């Protein structure tokens, strides 16, 4: 899980979603998981 100021899709499988007011990226590749914070 990477915590970043700006979250971006790193591949075509990445999905940008909102959970509990946070912007997150979920992906089949665990290295691409990101959270805004």
Swiss-Prot record:
Keyword Ribonucleoprotein in annotation: yes
Organism domain of life: Bacteria
Protein name: Large ribosomal subunit protein bL36
Alphabetical keyword list: Ribonucleoprotein, Ribosomal protein
UniProt cross-references to InterPro entries, sorted A to Z: Ribosomal_bL36, Ribosomal_bL36_sp
Cysteines joined through disulfide linkages: none
Natural source organism: Prochlorococcus marinus (strain MIT 9303)
GO BP, sorted A to Z: translation
Gene Ontology cellular component list: cytoplasm; ribonucleoprotein complex; ribosome
Family, as annotated: Belongs to the bacterial ribosomal protein bL36 family.
Any one GO molecular function term: structural constituent of ribosome
């Amino acid at each position: 899980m990477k915590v970043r100021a700006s979250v971006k899709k790193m591949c075509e499988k990445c999905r940008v979603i909102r959970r509990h007011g946070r912007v997150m990226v979920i992906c089949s590749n665990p290295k691409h998981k990101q959270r805004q914070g």
